[in-house]
Amino acid sequence: MVTTGSRTILVAHPGAEMFGSDRMLLESVIGMVETGARVVVALPARGLLDGALRAAGAEVVIVPMLVLRKVLLTPTGLPHLFRDLFRGLGAAWRLIGRVRPDAVYVSTIIIPQWPVIARLRRIRSVSHVHEAEASGNRLVNALLYLPHLASNSTLVNSRFSLDTIRGALPALARRSTVVYNGVGSPDDPEGPRAEIDGALRVLYVGRLSPRKGPDVIVDAAAALRRRGTDVTVTLLGAVFEGYEWYEEQLREQAASAEVDVVFAGFHTDVWPFLAEADVLVVPSRVDEPFGNTAVEGVLARRPVIASDSSGLREAAGGYSTAQLVPADDAEAVADALTVVRAEWPRIVSEVDAARAEGLRRHAPAIYRAAVAAAVLDTAL
């Protein structure tokens, strides 16, 4: 581990919730704090992440910043984009001048002002890319990645992300290094039940959005019900503001299909829900740069069914207790759930080996050390 008692790292992050990229930001900051560095985190708002960062030993400041969202690229959103851009540039310039960091760590590509201002301030910076949509417009991808050429180096969370960058902006890919996400878990998670008596308990963890595909699980459960198999579904997550219509649509879908669906809402602690589940399904319709949720399922000693696409292949691939299925295919998910039920004794016998492999691949300590070393080496 790199150790330092005299360096200051400024970290910029676009949100204050506790979803995937937020949790990885927290792990990154813990790694930096463990080196003895002073770590100052800039957020655009207060939230659950704010308190977790302070508990980890970081300082937190709230500053205006441009956070790229699709809504800003609409005719009504453009005035807000330019307002946030100029406010964000000024705030970043002033904060870097006040903190005087040795390095700036930019978490995600959707806060483009930070590497640019760091370069203008002659402060070295590291960008960490958690976003990748190979199926997206290549020009749009290139424009999103372009500001991060101002960083001195780039970390990416999967080979898929690296390949996506290479297809859009080869110059950035040549300066990028893959660091797989570190995923924490309980020391001794509850094992699966010895046999399935009654309904198969299916769990979904994540945002309730069409892109993430929880409706695919409801359709798969309906298909199993038609086949005579009893299934219960728990949806652990909430909608983005403005997507309340989608949750209502899910509720209507479940009621119409007569599927037993529990809307559990958002919880920061997913492990009790994994302990109650038999199988975790990750049915994303769109490209995922990685798939922390799939790894959490493996670490929880549960079988996993995930879309056979993008970074999910890296997250869920190579485990005997995980199945990859075509994206947006409810019948394929239903077939995979049938396999889980039919092969339950084998799965139960193999979940410990799968967990051991997941721990090897995604140990938080290794991730923290790798990110801290990249940032501090950049500052040398």
Where are these regions (language model features)?
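Conserved acidic donor-binding segment of nucleotide-sugar-dependent glycosyltransferases
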Residues: G318-E331, T338-W344
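Glycosyltransferase donor-sugar binding loop
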Residues: A42-L48, V183, V205, T232-E248
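Short hydrophobic beta-strand element within catalytic cores of glycosyltransferases
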Residues: P303-A306
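Carbohydrate-associated surface elements
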Residues: F160, G182
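Nucleotide-activated donor-binding/catalytic signature segment of Leloir-type glycosyltransferases, i.e.
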Residues: E247-G265
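A charged, aromatic-enriched C-terminal amphipathic alpha-helix characteristic of glycosyltransferases
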Residues: P345-L376
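A conserved mid-protein helix/loop that constitutes part of the nucleotide-sugar donor-binding site
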Residues: F19-I30, L200, Y204, S209-A223, ...
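An aromatic- and histidine-rich active-site surface loop
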Residues: G47-L48, L89, A103-R121, G136
